Amino acid sequence: VAVYHEGYLYAYSSRFLTCVDMATGKAMWKSRQPGDGFLILVDGHLVILTKEGSLHVAEANPSGYQEVARLDLFSDLSWTHPSFADGSIFVRSMGELARVDVRAGAVIPTAEAEAEEAPAEGVFQAFLNDVKAATHKKEVVDRFMAAQSEFPVIEGENLVHFLYRGEAGDMAIGGDMIGARQEESMTRIEGTDLFYYSTELQSDARVSYLFFRDYKDELLDPLNSKTARSTMWGADMELQVRGTEKQLSWLAMPHWKHPSHLDPPPDGLPRGRVETHELRSDIFGLTHSIAVYIPAGYDTSVDRYPTIYLHAGSDALERGEWTNSLDNLIQRTVEPLIVVFIDIGVGDIFIPRDDYGEVWAKEIVPFIDSTYRTNPVADARANAGSGDGAYDALYCAFKYPELSSRIAIQSLHMGDFGRERIEPLVQTADEHPLKIYMEWGIYDMRSPQEGWDMRENSRNLADWLLGRGYDVVAREVPDGTGWPSWKNRNDAVLQSLFPIGWND
């Protein structure tokens, strides 16, 4: 809700506090401080409670954000406007209430008074000290940048410094290591055009990220040539479901290992092929596509093959490099198999969950079994998926237990409502034996300021399924979200479902 004071509106635009001239409609300023939150106007001052639980008082001034006081109040999420009455500010978090009395002349620390957290002692901190002491700062920056063999700059096994050099009034960074719908400010080195953001990651981590310039421009890291494609991140680092593709920069820490199964198969290695089919669905009255991977040797064999139904399959084919993984792993660590890439409900087509499951069970599975030499038993069928495709896989597996008894899911996107739909379908391992592989990233999709965390949802579901006796392998991996992450473990998914000799 906006507030008005002396010809100007003050409000949040996305996550940024903004001042707008009512006469011209021009934005006078934007500020990342004090963080996303809720504001009221009291006696010419903005009183703001942030979602992280801090209380701020700033002048309502069109020249810029000028904080006069702050107080860290709550450790849990706050999601309501402050109130003011009888000289006191009243605020609440999800679990607590507080009254803050306003007193003239009270000394309350401001953001500017707090010491800025510096990077840990090391090469980069020494560089910062050198720049601070130098008369000719540009020369010190030039030498440091020229001495680097790669960017971002990694110190030791865990410390990483993201750098941006160029003209900007404000720079920020967003990505897997930070979470959805938020960025972290980058610090300008005074007297230079170099900005930095320092953090610690696991020594074998891989994360995707973007830079944000002057609140509007999304930038790849111009110093880092590693890029990836993802449909998980929308504008302003919003979570999106199979949305528009976005290019991201990515970083690997020193102990991360490139998955060789993603490489193009070597010359001479037998390769499978992908066939496409257009299926008319009588259940929802539309035509949809499926793609089917057929392993090398299928045409000269009389064998029947296990089948994986990969939900949200078009993304897996386009960005998940599944065909490379299949060609490289089959007959080595993975049994020869058929993979069906399902593409229902992509784009603007919304398919109710019950209809989706029915299409899979009553139309797709019978079509595949009648078209290809599948092994048509539950133990030879698997559901798999990543992100929202993981929820589709989970739903189909538990809704139709007679059709499949294996499942592999990555980064399950399932909130409380989704879990309420799944839990009534779940029986026990005695009633419905099911082999389950689950994984999620340490830096997976989450929004701390909105109180949701897909990592925690996955942990809770894994524990719940284990409690009901299911065979669950659950892994938390040092990676982020989207296909830049998931594809790195195509091998783990395949080997969890149908390893060589699975049916011996």
Model-predicted regions and their roles:
Residues V1-A111:
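Noncatalytic, solvent-exposed loop/strand surfaces
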Residues A27, A69, A98, M171, ...:
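Short beta-strand segments
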Residues A115-Q182, I189-D504:
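Non-catalytic cap/lid and distal C-terminal segments of serine-dependent acyl enzymes
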